Design a protein with these regions (language model features):
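Hydrophobic helix-and-loop "lid/oligomerization" segment in the mid-to-C-terminal part
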Residues: 2-3, 13-140, 159-160, 177, ...
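Acidic beta-strand-to-loop metal/phosphate-binding motif
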Residues: 84-86, 138-146, 597, 636-643
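Short, ordered loop/turn segments at secondary-structure junctions
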Residues: 88-89, 116-119, 146-147, 168-171, ...
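Short alpha-helices
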Residues: 99, 177-214, 220-232, 654, ...
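Acidic, two-metal ion nucleic-acid-processing modules in DNA metabolism proteins
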Residues: 105, 110, 243-338, 394-412, ...
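Active-site cavity-forming subdomains of large catalytic enzyme subunits
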Residues: 131-199, 203-212, 222, 239
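A short acidic, amphipathic alpha-helical/loop segment
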Residues: 152-156, 351, 366, 607-608, ...
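Conserved RecA-like helicase motor core of SF1/SF2 enzymes
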Residues: 629-675
Length: 784
């Protein structure tokens, strides 16, 4: 399988309005243009978005069951009851557990945290844990980032426990019989913002508790960095309350009093000032996640809540080691998953792979990478002692929770979001689950849903220069993330050179981009596999996020490419195509759908067609002009099997305009020789006409007539019907109904035969096309 190139969705905005608003707000039109694209249409809404509003947070008591929850917690604090915060092992759950623990501690509460062990306990509430918690004296359990799917566990919990569920996951039809449930997604909950993370819900609980203590600085204001940590890591929309939480939290991180967070920032190599959402997503969150995936997330909670700097540094170093190990395990599983994919038959709806020994805590990361690469819903499953535990990731068009819910009769446990989920089922039911899941996906999605898209905020003109000043202005859009993506720009017809692989695994692409009078260094993460399709000084359209890069105390603009549209990626196998049928079958095996253009669809050997099966579709070059974009874009690979009788540059241009992405040339030197030999026969020159004349006259010496069929059968490589027709035009013979008769001989010139003149002109044209099609270099073809 080959990864799919993204379709660009180029946004547009009113440039005059952008200029007007930019002047009113005293910011760059580049920023106001992007905000116009994103639905903000006036200066007031833009000002609130960029700088924050005076009252950014909704009343927490608008959340259903908040009043009941606060009253129960207040009673527990007043009576000195033991409270346990029951969390989850991802960053959202870790930060939510830490935030609520620290807040309740500051309020004088007797509080503990409990994070289930991923491998042995799995996600969410479990009977044994609740039993043990109760036996240790806890009377109030507050869940964070989990619990909404724990119907059975809450029902079976010890009667001595009151359970308050705070969660943000999809709400099931039947709710657990908990003391209270705080989840903005409940059907009868009137809270106006539905996209809070788990830590966001915990934050709202702290807000509500603070409103009972007026007249003092709210304790939660000192914990916004934890709210930012989980909100960014859980990839919830960074709009509304989430945006304000993250904005405040990122600022608070620079001067945080949380010694564990300071140690983590230092260990991860993040800057101590100017911390951005990217630093959480790529620096802090992976380290917190790693310990939860490989060992026990309780260690991450200990880091975030400790006030011991020595202990914090020790745990941060341990998290670094766990993260390095997680990266290695991820690489190994990715390789094994790719190997399985290579053995699978036709995969066009969803990827479902399983293996003994795959680390349950890491398969979700690999599933995400497979989705990024192939743009197919993906489930990776770890098999252990007859139990199959899977991590699921989706594409935007598929609601993954609904897709898995449709197979709930096969599952022992499941839960999740629109785009990510987890599940458990008996291993023996895996084949049935795989079949039904793929059928569900096939019924729900259309062909166009499988095509990845890339939003482009602005296509820059050739004279545009991206400056440090521009990037400082774009920083006003931070924090960026889900539903407030970092802006993406594009250059058309940029020149790329000095391409090479970089990184420890040599899996990243580095290049230099020239546009107009400006030159930029660029990179593209995890895309070194594009190198075989690239060449020095190639022309391409490049979509990118501009970043400030500091190296050796020098500051420059660096382009982080997210999509490169080479005019068409071209595989040139003309010099290596001695066995074109073997190569064609190889391409059909690698790609889900190969469309092969050929001069004669009947010329392919039957065994090739049989072996390729549904992977291979044939089309004549004559069909190419009328082929729909939809049909063409369904093919992952276009193969030019025979030397075409049309200019190859025109074919490449048409394929590019129709949206073809990958083209392979399979015609070779023998094809060229065969075409020229056939031209010599079907478009005879003077020497060929003299030879044909002698053959006909010799045949007519023995009898008065001769059959054209008989003549061609005896001399197939020396004479053609066109030569006979030319002789008829010159009056040398009479030719009717396939029978040749001798006529009176008269002196004349070959040029007196219109057919001869036409054929010579056509021969000259076709010879030039054939030779030029074979001669044109890959570089020249891609510049067409």
């Amino acid at each position: 399988m080959m990864h799919k190139e993204r379709i660009w969705d180029i946004k547009e905005y009113n440039s005059q309005m952008a200029d007007y608003l930019a002047e009113e707000l005293n910011i760059s039109p580049m920023v106001t243009g992007i905000l116009l694209e994103r639905g903000l249409q006036d200066a007031a809404s833009m000002r609130d978005f960029l700088y924050g509003s005076a009252a950014p947070f909704h009343d927490p008591f608008l959340l259903k069951d908040m009043q009941r929850s606060v009253e129960r917690i207040e009673r527990a604090l007043a009576a000195g009851e033991q409270i346990t915060v029951y969390g989850d092992y991802d960053v959202d759950g870790i930060s939510a557990s830490s935030l609520l623990y620290l807040y309740l501690k500051q309020r004088g509460g007797r509080v503990a945290t409990y994070i289930p062990q991923r491998k042995s306990e799995g996600y969410g509430l479990n009977d044994e844990a609740l039993k043990n918690i109760a036996e240790k004296g806890t009377t109030l359990v507050i869940t964070v980032d989990c619990g909404i799917s724990g119907l059975r566990e809450v029902a079976n919990a010890p009667k001595s426990l009151d359970i308050i569920i705070t969660d943000h996951h999809t709400v099931p039809e039947v709710l657990p019989p908990a003391y209270a449930i705080i989840n903005a997604k409940q059907r009868d909950c009137g809270y106006p913002f539905k996209d809070l993370s788990g830590v966001g819900i915990a934050f709202k609980l702290c807000q509500a508790l603070e409103q009972r203590e007026p007249g003092r600085l709210p304790e939660w204001q000192g914990l916004t960095e934890l709210a930012a940590l989980g909100t960014v890591a859980d990839i919830v929309p960074l709009i509304g309350e989430n945006r304000e939480l993250v904005r405040r939290g990122l600022k608070a991180m620079e001067t945080t009093k949380l010694v564990g967070l300071r140690a983590l920032i230092k260990a991860s190599g993040c800057p101590e000032t100017g911390i951005a959402s990217d630093n959480i997503g790529f620096g802090l969150a992976p380290r917190l996640n790693a310990v939860g995936r490989l060992e026990h997330a309780q260690l991450a909670v200990e880091l975030l809540v400790t006030d011991d700097s020595v202990k914090a540094e020790k745990i941060a170093a341990e998290l670094n080691r766990e993260n390095a190990l997680r990266q290695e395990i991820s690489r190994q599983i990715m390789e094994e998953a790719e190997a399985q994919l290579a053995q699978e038959k036709h995969i066009d709806t969803a990827i479902v792979l399983a293996s003994e020994g795959w680390h349950q805590g890491v398969i979700g990361i690999v599933a995400s990478r497979l989705v990024d690469k192939y743009h197919l819903p993906t489930i990776l499953i770890s098999l252990n002692n007859g139990v199959a535990k899977g991590s699921c990731r989706s594409i935007p068009a598929l609601n993954l929770y609904e897709a898995i819910d449709a197979e709930r009769d096969l599952l022992t446990q499941y839960g999740g979001h629109h785009q990510a989920a987890g599940l458990t089922l008996p291993a023996e039911l895996l084949p049935e689950f795989k079949r039904r899941f793929r059928e569900y996906v096939a019924q729900k999605l259309r062909p166009e849903d499988y095509l990845p898209h890339q939003a482009i905020d602005c296509v820059l003109s050739g004279s545009s220069e991206i400056s440090i000043r521009d990037l400082e202005q774009l920083a006003l859009l931070e924090p960026c993330g889900c539903e407030n993506q970092a802006p993406v720009f594009a250059f058309r017809q940029a020149l790329l050179h000095n391409q090479r692989a970089m990184g420890k695994e040599r899996n990243h692409l580095q290049f230099v981009l020239d546009k107009g009078y400006n030159s930029y260094r660029g990179l593209m993460w995890n895309n070194a596999d594009l190198l075989p399709y690239m060449f020095e000084n190639m022309v391409a359209d490049v979509a990118f996020q501009p970043k400030i890069n500091v190296w050796n105390n020098e500051t420059s603009v660096q382009l982080q490419a997210v999509s490169i549209h080479q005019q068409v990626t071209l595989g040139d196998m003309r010099q290596a195509a001695d066995d074109k049928w073997r190569l064609l079958l190889g391409l059909a095996k690698v790609h889900n759908k190969v469309l092969a253009y050929t001069e004669d669809k009947q010329s392919l050997p039957a065994e090739v067609l049989q072996t390729a099966g549904d992977y291979l579709e044939l089309a004549s070059y004559e069909e190419a002009a009328g082929m729909s974009k939809e049909r063409l874009q369904q093919a992952e690979e276009i193969v030019l099997l025979d030397l075409p009788a049309y200019p190859l540059a025109d074919i490449m241009r048409r394929l590019r305009q129709q949206g073809a992405k990958h083209v392979t040339l399979l015609f070779n030197q023998p094809d060229l020789q065969e075409r020229l030999q056939r031209l010599a026969l079907t478009h005879p020159d003077r020497d060929a006409m003299m030879q044909a004349y002698k053959l006909v006259m010799n045949a007519l010496k023995m009898r008065t007539t001769v059959s054209i069929k008989e003549l061609l059968s005896a001399h197939a490589e020396q004479i053609s019907e066109q030569a006979v027709k030319i002789m008829e035009e010159l009056g040398f013979i009479r030719y009717n109904n396939g029978i040749i008769e001798k006529a009176a001989i008269k002196r004349c010139s070959l040029e007196d035969a219109p057919l001869y003149v036409t054929l010579q002109q056509e021969r000259e044209r076709l010879e030039h096309i054939y030779k030029e099609n074979y001669r044109l270099s890959q570089h020249e073809l891609l510049r067409c």
